[in-house]
């Protein structure tokens, strides 16, 4: 009986060692984007993302806007009472965005998590590289992506205006980026 249990434990240990990223919190790439931090992993068909800023309000990221926010796939959220609220938005105008669902799209965020510690809000989530949703343009993995970053003040509401925003050009495959 002891040999059987020992054999099972050894087998489980070997399986867990063979899957090193199962509980990994490390990211392939991390950039300090002025007042925010952006970390990500590119997988075969998805992208794991972590964004954070020194705020107790919302934080957000947008992918490949046409101009300002127009046409961007925008993910933003906040943490309230220890629970993350993360939404999938689309840039409907240069200076406006709204939930994908209101436009006829769908929410394409998985693994939503968040924390608010020592005045810093951190969100992590996974998005598909190409969801097929017209309100989530495909994420560019080769070449330069235009990325927008923003965070709001110290209020748990997505209706508040940003206190900080910036636009960067980032090569998501190499991790290189610069302010636009």
What are these model-predicted stretches?
Residues 1-4:
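Positively charged n-region of N-terminal signal peptides that target proteins for export
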Residues 23-180:
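Extracellular-facing/secreted segment signature in eukaryotic proteins
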């Amino acid at each position: 009986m002891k040999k059987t249990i020992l054999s099972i434990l050894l087998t489980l240990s070997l399986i867990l060692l063979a899957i090193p990223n199962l509980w990994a919190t490390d990211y392939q790439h991390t950039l300090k984007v002025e007042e925010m931090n952006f970390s990500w992993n590119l997988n075969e068909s998805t992208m794991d993302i972590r964004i954070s800023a020194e705020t107790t309000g919302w934080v957000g990221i947008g992918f490949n806007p046409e101009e300002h926010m127009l046409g961007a796939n925008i993910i933003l959220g906040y943490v309230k009472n220890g629970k993350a609220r993360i939404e999938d938005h689309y840039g409907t105008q240069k200076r406006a965005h709204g939930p994908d669902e209101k436009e006829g799209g769908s929410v394409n965020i998985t693994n939503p998590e968040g924390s608010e510690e020592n005045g810093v809000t951190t969100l992590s989530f996974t998005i598909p590289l190409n969801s097929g949703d017209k309100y989530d343009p495909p994420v560019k993995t080769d070449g330069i992506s235009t990325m927008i970053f923003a965070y709001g003040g110290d209020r748990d509401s997505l209706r508040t205006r940003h206190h900080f925003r910036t636009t960067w050009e980032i090569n998501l495959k190499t991790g290189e980026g610069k302010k636009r």
